[in-house]
Structures are given as C-alpha cells and as structure tokens.
Amino acid sequence: YMCNPSECFMDMVERLAERIPVVIINNQNEKLSLDAVELDNSKLGRLMARHLLDLGHKKVAYITPPLTTRQKQRSKRTEGFLKEFEKEGLKSQVIVKEAGEQMDIGVANVDSEYRVGYELTKELMEEEADLTAIVGLNDMIALGILDALYELKYRVPHDVSVMGCDN
C-alpha cells in the first residue's frame, strides 16, 4: 500500500503496481487507475465545524500544516470546515493559520506536526486573544496547541476550547 503518494513519485507507484498489488490510502490520484481507500475529509471538516458551532463558538482559529497539492486531504478538510462556518455567515470569523511550505520538504512526523500546533498557537495568541476555540488539523497539532495554551496560562476549556481529530 502507499500512503499519500505525491506527484513526484507517481511514476514509481505505477511501475510498482505492474508487479504487485498496490492500494493508495488517502490522496487518490486521478491519473492512476489503482484501488484507493479514502476518508471524506470535506465531511470531517464540516462535522468538526458543526460541533463547534453547536457549542456556540463563533470566533475560532484553525491551525494546519501547509495546504499543498502534495497533501490534498488537508485542503479538503479545511475547505469543509470553512464551508460550515460560511453557511452560518461566520466564515470571516475563522482565522486559518497555516505553516510554511518548508515543513513539507521532508516527511512530516509527529514532532513536526506537534511543533506546528505549538508555534502557531504562540503566534496566534499574540495577535488574537479573543478566540473561543482553536482547531488543529489533526491530534498532534492539537497537542501542540494545548501545550502552548498551558504555557501561556490559558485554561482549557474554560478560556479556550481545543479540538483535533485523526486519533
């Protein structure tokens, strides 16, 4: 199986599939006719946003690694999240804080995603202290968010709610 095959090695994936069975997990590429298992990331983003909206959150931040074509599921999840806030007329109240593209030069790992949450939350809270919730694209980012908030003496969930997903 291949998890998140990027454009740069699609030819290799295609050659490999000629010799052995290959299943792509997430990031199915339309150019390849291979089996794939995909998560509906747009729906996941909408569900996350709907939960926050149902709890009364209006001013939220969304922290994500780079929204590049290499990891299109990130963009789908983010778009779904924003669409749900847009339906309520609150899209302008969502701050999307995106890591720089240098993060995607290597292979993303637990530490790099944690750092994205931690560092971008520190930046964010210097700029926007009136947020009611901060969302991490995934749980490792959410853990970084939590640690940054604790360090800044915010009480979670009393002062700010935090959400992540993906286990």
Predicted regions: what they are:
Residues M10-I24, Q28-N167:
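Bacterial carbohydrate/catabolite-sensing allosteric modules
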Residues Y1-C8:
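Central regulatory/effector-binding core of bacterial HTH transcription factors
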